[in-house]
């Protein structure tokens, strides 16, 4: 008997403008067994390593195992039919995670692209990439700060999308290493900047810029 096994990418979530998160799973007959690594896809045959997204992991399991378990449960009796329908519904529900849907989440995704060169959320970025991006963003902010801090942009606003994107990026990366209370303040300021931005233009070429 030949056992077909290996690794596969599945669990696509948070897609926008051709970018999305997936998880690389060990599989048997294409059925995911356990997650191996997270990936952020930035274009055709391009991407970068990312931390594992729990949404992607759940989606990867639910979209493959869910229908199979649901179908099997339906043959066990009336209670199994109910359980089977529940499995199928739960599997289908993860499709809502496939794309970035709300306007606020879309603006955050766009600002991620402008600031970091990837739409990946900062908490999924690997440490080495954060360590490379943060001094670059802080240096860029130093050139355009005009005596303000990134939090000042959140409080007082700006008509300059470049300043908004860089301030947003500095705040989000800073939040990763701050104590919880300060991190929450930085994230709140970044969210305020995103809420105030309506029209975004490309801010140069990031290392993972999508075509």
What are these regions (language model features)?
Residues 1-211:
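A composition-biased, non-transmembrane "mature-region" signal
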